[in-house]
Amino acid sequence: MILNDDVKLIPGSKVEAVIKISKEFVKGKYNEILQDYSSRLKIKGFRIGKVPFSIIEGKYSDNIRALTIEKLIHKSLEEFFKSATYKPLGYAVPKILDEKLEIDFNKDFEFTVVYEAYPEFEIPDISNVEVEIPEVTVSDSDVEDELKLLQLENAMVVDDSGDVKVGSIVRVDFVELDDSLSEILTTKRQDFVFTVGESNNYYGFDNDIIGMKKDEEKIIEKNYSADYKFSELANSFKRLKIIIKDIKKRDIPELDDDFAKDIKDSFNTLEELKAHIRENMLRLVKEKRESLKLSKLLSDVSEKLNIEIPSAMFEAELKNVVNEFSTQNKIDLKKLNDSSMGLEGVSDVFKENVLKKLKSKLVFQKIVDNDLTEITDADLEDELVKQAEDTKMRLSEIKKFYQEKNLLGILKDEIKRQKVKDKILKNVKEIKLKEIAFRDFINYKTGE
């Protein structure tokens, strides 16, 4: 079908291709559509399928030619992309540059398409890249801290007949009052639940309600400093009416052998639980160390390269990041857009980081593509066995899932990516920094 294609790279990580289709194929596709029209058209005086082509062409020529061009472009692009050196991104639709395409049965059909592709660049030698990683040890106090967190997670929330204290879980109604002590209805909030002393409530009235009892009402006055955490309230005065509707407390379990058994039947003693916690913490340290090493290496390599990120790829990733931010912080995108920064302002905050992450992703993908490691059936079988063990499923069920969903190819790609990652981590040079605490290490980011 395609006689030839003239391909060239253009700025913006884009590809321009001039595709030429044989006139014989064009004529054949046109006749095919014409025949389809003939088999379906109802024209007075003719049986279906017996309408002369000349009559159909006289009445529907423009439609048939337009549909022929549409089919030619779709079919030829499908064929072109299968063998294209520069694969198109899935983020954007290829654009046909020709403003008006016409069919001339005496000439080959030609059109120009522009599409965004993965950027072209070469990976430099990464054997001498050095990565700085802080030292970390898991101490007994670290284990105790994690145990206390587990203790809090398993606390029961029960009614508290006493007054409000730091740590109380309260349900309140509150509203701003004007100078005449009338309620400003737009500020009214009902059944607001928070933990006293641990919340980030807008008005910051945690300390003002300490000592209050259930069903008690109180009017408080607040003067907010210039550096208050919510700029809308900075340098302002507010009068609030607060009603305590409910008070609860956490019934924290004792740290003993029974607590360990409640966490998991296989634990007989508290010491066994502590050993399990330490093992998990050491695993987290190992995973974090590997993640930091790979992230730092990819970042260092990408900074040395001039990688032109396709605009469609960048916009898609930026949109995902903003949506994730909105979801995590439970902020509706419309409200985000109506905020003082606006949606565009919020997006600007993430742009630099998104750009860096995309460059690192592209560098890693290029390393994977360049790697000659082949994934064998044995590698695939080992991974399926591991997944069956981890999920407590039968191996046959795991295999059936991947086969029915047509995911074995994707799984092979993931296995290769992990093998390449392991190879990189094995060879990277690590420079150890000063020791930091476990929790600080888990929250540590490269460049800190």
Swiss-Prot record:
Keyword DNA damage recorded: no
PPIase FKBP-type domain span: 167-253
Stored Pfam families: Trigger_C, Trigger_N
InterPro entries: PPIase_dom_sf, Trig_fac, Trigger_fac_C, Trigger_fac_C_sf, Trigger_fac_ribosome-bd_bac, Trigger_fac_ribosome-bd_sf, Trigger_fact/SurA_dom_sf
GO molecular function: peptidyl-prolyl cis-trans isomerase activity
Subcellular location: Cytoplasm
HAMAP family: Trigger_factor_Tig (MF_00303)
GO biological process: cell division; protein folding; protein transport
Keyword annotations of the record: Cell cycle, Cell division, Chaperone, Cytoplasm, Isomerase, Rotamase
Family recorded in the similarity comment: Belongs to the FKBP-type PPIase family. Tig subfamily.
EC number: 5.2.1.8
Functional summary from the UniProt entry: Involved in protein export. Acts as a chaperone by maintaining the newly synthesized protein in an open conformation. Functions as a peptidyl-prolyl cis-trans isomerase.
Record-linked NCBIfam families: tig
The protein's name in its UniProt record: Trigger factor
Native organism: Borrelia hermsii (strain HS1 / DAH)
Predominant subcellular localization, coarse grouping: cytoplasm
Superkingdom field: Bacteria
SUPFAM superfamilies, sorted: FKBP-like, Triger factor/SurA peptide-binding domain-like, Trigger factor ribosome-binding domain
Top-rank EC class of the record's enzyme: isomerase
The record's note on its domains: Consists of 3 domains; the N-terminus binds the ribosome, the middle domain has PPIase activity, while the C-terminus has intrinsic chaperone activity on its own.
Reactions catalysed: [protein]-peptidylproline (omega=180) = [protein]-peptidylproline (omega=0)
SS bond list: none
